[in-house]
Structures are given as C-alpha cells and as structure tokens.
C-alpha cells in the first residue's frame, strides 16, 4: 500500500495542515499554550501538574512553557505555602485578554477543518478517535 494511503501518514498531514493554519492565524500562541490557557481559565488556580494532560507534554516541557508564558505576562504561578513542590497557576489580566481574542480564532480554525465533515461524520470521527485512544 502506498504511503499516501496509510492512515497515520494522512493523520500527520492533516495535523501539519492544521498547525500551519493555526500558526498563520495565531502566530504568537502555540496550540499547547492555547490548551493550557483554556484549562487554566476553566479552573483558575489549577495545580501545575494537572496541566500536563492539557499540554500533552512532559512535566519538564510544561514547566518551561509556563515559565515562558509567565515571562510574557500571560500566567502567574504561586507555590503552595505548605509544600513548595506544588505550584498553582492563574491567567493574568493580559492572559485573559489574549485568550479571549484567541478563542474565536482557534474555534474558526478547528471549524475550517471539522466543517469538511457532516455533523454525523464529526461525531463518528470523535468516537473513532476516542476508541483508538482507548478512552
């Protein structure tokens, strides 16, 4: 079977197209940063370690990303007074502003791709992805 007909090759191409479109529309915010900001907005003061899943990254990579975001003034982190190993994360006012502007753009990029499928196909697609991820 030709490589162009392999499922994971096509998925990789799809993700590359989506990422290129994302970077064009939101050049100052990566998809992992966006996902982390959405998770923080959903649960202000979230424990840093809980953001690993949202970032789809390692603990070290997440810590580096949050440090960069903190330097940009998008998030603030605080240590737990009782346990310095624990850190909690909030969006700053600037982070809230950036996220508020990014959400409709990110949704639009996603819809540009998902809109190629009917509502039924979108539901089936999500079911199949969840099944393959075993969740």
From Swiss-Prot:
<keyword id="KW-0804">Transcription</keyword>
<feature type="domain" description="HTH marR-type">
    <location>
        <begin position="4"/>
        <end position="134"/>
    </location>
</feature>
<protein>
    <recommendedName>
        <fullName>Transcriptional regulator HosA</fullName>
    </recommendedName>
</protein>
<keyword id="KW-0238">DNA-binding</keyword>
<keyword id="KW-0843">Virulence</keyword>
<dbReference type="InterPro" id="IPR000835">
    <property type="entry name" value="HTH_MarR-typ"/>
</dbReference>
<dbReference type="InterPro" id="IPR036390">
    <property type="entry name" value="WH_DNA-bd_sf"/>
</dbReference>
<dbReference type="GO" id="GO:0003700">
    <property type="term" value="F:DNA-binding transcription factor activity"/>
</dbReference>
<dbReference type="InterPro" id="IPR023187">
    <property type="entry name" value="Tscrpt_reg_MarR-type_CS"/>
</dbReference>
<dbReference type="Pfam" id="PF01047">
    <property type="entry name" value="MarR"/>
</dbReference>
<comment type="function">
    <text>Involved in the temperature-dependent positive control of flagellum-driven swimming motility and cellular aggregation. Regulates fliC expression by directly interacting with fliC promoter.</text>
</comment>
<feature type="DNA-binding region" description="H-T-H motif">
    <location>
        <begin position="48"/>
        <end position="71"/>
    </location>
</feature>
<dbReference type="InterPro" id="IPR036388">
    <property type="entry name" value="WH-like_DNA-bd_sf"/>
</dbReference>
<dbReference type="GO" id="GO:0003677">
    <property type="term" value="F:DNA binding"/>
</dbReference>
<keyword id="KW-0805">Transcription regulation</keyword>
